[in-house]
Amino acid sequence: KHFAVHPECYAMGPDGKRRGVRNARSQICYTNPETYRLVLEALKGFVEADRKECPDDPPLVYDFTQQDNAEFLCLCPDCRREIARYDRGDGHAQGGDAGLQLAFVNRLARDIRATYPDVIIRTFAYNSTECAPKPGTISVEPNVRIWWCDLYSRSDHTVPLETSGHFNAARAQTLKDWLALTDNVEIWDYMLYDATYPEVSVRAIARDIGLLASGHVRAVFVEAEYTDQPFYELNTYLQ
């Protein structure tokens, strides 16, 4: 909709070019002032329309987050400088992108709260934004909710997250880093996503749900729709 008029509002890739939303990996430019103006204007329009359509029971949670299947947000010089502020030292995917997105979302949350104090802005911690920003660099507004995604490609869902000596322990720490930053966290989990594995996640489910509950996670959404998994009905019941 906006690329022809405002290409500067779209993410710059490592090749220095900006691409529109028809490109699967295209994002927005998070530091461009016009980007923010357009997003805030659209958000206010959605909220106002919903209040008119459903005055007695309007939606309260609005999602703003990155596009799927992207390895970075924006690599323009201004965004790179912001990324460096929040980076834990291992690249943009180690807190830098999360900080870049969270700063943008925090601003949205503050501005929308002035008119609609009951509205919550939800944003993903996923792919390049899955790791929390460097401690002490940013806070989370009270009307911002983090939706942390436990990527099935980065953990073993047949083993509990908190398993000493297992690579899942690093995933558990990533979640704990977010919970140290805010208690307004939801989970998008897969439990056991692939259809081809002769494995069962039953033992892991109970311990993982216990971990999430003890961490004061607000809600859990489980994506595990392949019906030819072993013990599919039991897994679904437990989830």
State where each predicted segment sits:
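Catalytic-core regions of glycoside hydrolase
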Residues: 1-33, 37, 41-239
